[in-house]
Amino acid sequence: MLTRHASGDTHLSYWPRVRQFAVPPSMIETATARRLAGDWAGACAAAGVDVDLNPRSVARTHGRELAARLRADLRHLAPDLLRWHLPRIAPDGLLRPGLTISLARYDATGQPGAHPVHLVARTPPAWADAGQRISLTLWDGFRGAHGFRGAHGSYGSHSSYGFLASHADAGARRHPHPHPSRRFRLDLHRHLWDARRTDELRTRSGADRPPGGDGPAPAPDPLGRVPQGRRCAVDRWAAEAELLLDADGRSTGTGAGVVTVRFGARRRLLLELVAAPDGGGPPALRITEAPKGSHASGLPVLPDASTWVPPDLELLRAGAIEVDRLHPLVASALVPDRPDRPPAGPPRIPDRAGEPRLVECRGARHRIALVDGVLSPLDHDPAELRREELLAELTGTPMPCLRAIDEAHRHPDCLTGVRERLDHGDIAGALAVVEGLLGPEAVLRGGALRDELERAAERRITYGLFRAGLIGAGPGPGPGPGSRGRPHGRRTH
């Protein structure tokens, strides 16, 4: 989720644009078709996911049973849905960089001393985030020789043990945070990526209840401690904390236990589940400030996906988005009784191909449109155009029709949309907008549009170098190689 603002509903203004550009309909359509055809690797490719694992090598290393469970999960992985739900940062809604997120945990059976294996998704560091690519790999521990340290709890200890394969080893070494995050994890939220379980989103998100519905009432008044202006899923915290304690092997059988919930780097709360006196009802939830010190850091962390009301549910309740603009699997889960409709097409883009545009030119309305794949004036003969182009070179003042074409090349009205598509990795969508405006045969002139496309290409090279391990650990705090110098967004919470 994106960073929340104390001003209340400010975040609702940019989530619709995130939903418009981050996972385009063409990606969803292609990835879904390949997944339904049984081509999980092809679905990943369509969704911008780089696969860094080999199920055959998993069978040799960890046994056929674990490999079979992995293959079943890969067949039902909806990578476009995973991209839809991954944590994002404000203000642009880009993927939160430098994360390793556990999607599934496989406990080894019949192998004494074997450590759990995690299917993980990784996002690259911010300086190498061109294309908003995601990598999919396996993780079975930490290697002390590379200086990696384990996390507390179920995600490892300070012991040293090996990686699955050389490629995963290299990927972990070049990643800033190679071990699975305790806060950003989806192994307890399989409905956010597993096509078999997407219907669970309705219950887990609270969409089956009105806002502030009939969940267990926290006591005492938690809202005095919960940061104001943030859509915390307080009515789900008790149930989510029970799931967390059970998954991490800390369940007491009575529902009692303690977990932490994080709000950014400096704010934490303790969620204490207090068993009912007679043991016959759900545990009560007591919320207190987390004490400073090591005690709280060793407690289980409520997953980020459990902490907040999902943005799609907020948008629907606020009337800020149409249900047909949501991912189809999300829409069917949140609004199961909606009439069957075809998936929403891509958003309408300005200056559609084939439609002439009107320009006020010397007291008359003239047209400019695509002719033989190039944006051209329609109401001036070739001799007049040659004469006007020569005069423009001498005087620097072209006639309005030529000036409109030049402006379309250098700084078109659609530049913001092109930039957002490039930022989110939708190269094909960005080029479609440009070609719809200027034509497929156009030669770009110097200006902001050409600069954006060139920077996008440079940043893709930077990502390739990062993937290949040829660029070291990356730059310092300043803009990375190929960066267009935009300030990094604030991270979530």
Tell what function each PLM region has.
Residues R196-E200, R209-Q228, C232, W237, ...:
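Long, charge-rich C-terminal accessory regions
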Residues M1-Q228, C232-D235, L245-G249, L437-L438, ...:
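N-terminal membrane-targeting/anchoring modules of bacterial envelope and secretion proteins
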Residues I101-L103, V261, R357-V359:
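Short acidic-hydrophobic surface loop/beta-edge motif
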Residues G264-H493:
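C-terminal structured domains
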